[in-house]
Amino acid sequence: ADTLVTQGAVQSNHARQTAAAAAILGLKCHILLERRIPDKIDEYERTGNVFLDKIHGATVEFRESSIDMNAEGEAVSKQLSENGAKPYFIPGGGSNAVGALGYVSCAMELISQFDVNSIKFDCLIHATGSTGTQAGLVSGLCALSSELPVIGISVRQKRERQIDAVWKLVRETVEKLNINDIKRDKILVDDNYIGKGYAIPTDGTLEAIDLLAKTEGILLDPVYSGKAMAGLI
């Protein structure tokens, strides 16, 4: 491959990290950004991660909301290939079986640290969006025969739709781990903290961000970790 292709929301952290990785490896990078949030000012598409995408040398294109962005990425990859490039497509959030293996490793590291330090927890709580984090954690814990529940606080989709998406990726991930006894009821999703939609913080999100900043010196974001912390609280 000589070109990385990926997609995400306008201010996608994953897209920015992909652009940086491409720069390090001497690869070209083509990013598709979805306008998920209505009524944003023009600066929203020129600043922050979009600016950093371009600083890293990525080609950036925008798409309107409510289209299949992974299908769009595949189509762009095909077009680049027809023009002589050798593209490698990475789904949004890096959420495929290969990407989920990163959070399989995370699950293993967590359990190792729990054992070494004799720590016990009732559950893991995190923000669930493009599904890679939750699928990787659930698959990794299953590989370790751990019964520790993983609760995903949805930042975008309703519960059943998110469970379907996570379960699809779990099945693809455990296949790589040669596991075949995982059950769908391991996928736990709470959709009570989405509010008005993706990247639109609720009052609870803002309160959680304020609380952590003032009591722990930890900065959360209004898209993912702020909603997850609101769910934990």
Give the ranges of each region predicted by the language model.
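PLP-dependent amino-acid enzyme catalytic core
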Residues: 1-233
